[in-house]
Regions:
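Carbohydrate-active catalytic/glycan-binding domains of CAZyme proteins
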Residues: 1-351
């Protein structure tokens, strides 16, 4: 008799694991999630080394720990381990290898590591730089680099970065920089693709301007730029037919406090504690999902990954997903037995 598959829960990883900022990809029949690494009872963001988890595309409740794929001390700027590894992203280069892009918490340049397999041990590869060897982020015209998101098409890799806090008029918006086939050298100079809150007036992004967490996907001939907005708890998207220009605001994909959802509460009532958010979309089989994170343990620094199935209209509009306890399960959890309290997705509070 064939054994019954495990139910897929939210958070989708074991209760003791804290992988926020999840970037999901499907490689060779498995879903791999790359993210930063928080700790239980953490006191800052991203205290751990990069680890990876994966699951079969047809068994999304069966996650496997792939181990440490990149220790923080591997970067030459961080041999003493004093800096944290912030949110990463991964892309497959023209040579078929896997490239990991990241920024250290007290650096402003983009580091790159490489591996022959999706979840092997990545080795430091270099820093993104221009044709004169000057690092992106070190040049006078550069804004500090943060939260890299990457997409490779042919010999070009599109690198998206940026952080725009409210009131900081030195930051413009989300940036895109085109890299050459070596995955490090700038081929086309940086352009701004989505405005931050200080530059959003009259753009259509007002109220949902770029804050951080840029991520890029392609659906058909349309580029979907996923990002955390100025209100932090929501992941929004913008769309364009070009990877480096013409993005227009699309809407909210998910809020980690379910703001705007009115099916079971008033739309302006939060269903949980909302705070920063980071993630992206992925197609698994015939369906698309949004991976995001929520906050636990009464702190900002112990975040856990969740995922929800998406409804996408024929014209490419992503409808906001409601947060659940069973996002990857294909339906509700079985209504029998006991479930741990940490799966609860709605925690209403009277302040």
């Amino acid at each position: 008799m064939k054994s019954q598959k495990k139910q897929a829960l939210n958070p989708y990883l074991p209760s003791w694991e804290y992988i926020p900022d999840g970037e999901p990809y499907v490689f060779d029949g498995r879903v791999y999630v790359y993210g930063s690494h928080d700790f239980y009872n953490g006191y800052v963001f991203c205290m751990g080394d990069y680890v990876c988890w994966s699951a079969p595309v047809d068994d999304l409740g069966n996650w496997r720990y792939e181990g440490v794929i990149y220790p923080k001390t591997e970067d030459p700027l961080n041999r003493d381990g004093s800096m944290c590894l912030y949110a990463p992203d991964v892309t497959v280069g023209p040579d078929g290898r896997y490239y990991l892009y990241y920024v250290l918490d007290h650096a402003h340049v983009v580091s790159v590591a490489v591996c022959d397999t999706p979840a092997g041990r990545y080795q430091f590869y270099g820093y993104v730089h221009d044709k004169n060897g000057v690092l992106l982020g070190d040049r006078p015209q550069d804004e500090p680099q943060f939260d890299p998101g990457v997409l490779t098409e042919g010999n070009s890799t599109y690198l998206y970065t940026g952080f725009c806090g409210q009131g900081d008029k030195t930051r413009t918006g989300a940036m895109a920089t085109v890299l050459g086939p070596d995955m490090l050298t700038i081929e086309e100079e940086t352009v701004f693709v989505v405005p931050g809150c200080e530059t959003s007036d009259g753009t259509g992004f007002e109220g949902h301007a770029f804050f951080e967490a840029p991520s890029i996907r392609k659906m058909g001939d349309t580029y979907y730029f996923v990002y955390s907005s100025e209100v932090m708890h929501e992941l929004c998207y913008a769309v364009s037919k070009s990877p480096t220009s013409g993005f227009r605001y699309g809407g909210v994909i998910v809020s980690n406090c379910d703001l705007h959802i009115d099916t079971y509460k008033p739309a302006d009532m939060p269903a949980a504690y909302g705070a920063n958010n980071h993630g992206s979309i992925v197609q698994i089989g015939e369906d698309w999902y949004i991976f995001y994170h929520r906050h636990t343990n009464g702190t900002w620094y112990s975040r856990q990954g969740c995922a929800e199935k998406l409804e996408i209209t024929e014209d490419g509009v992503i409808c906001q997903a409601e947060i659940t306890s069973c996002g990857l399960n294909g339906g509700p959890l079985i209504g029998e037995g006991e479930y741990p309290a940490y799966l609860a997705c709605n925690i209403f509070c009277l302040l």
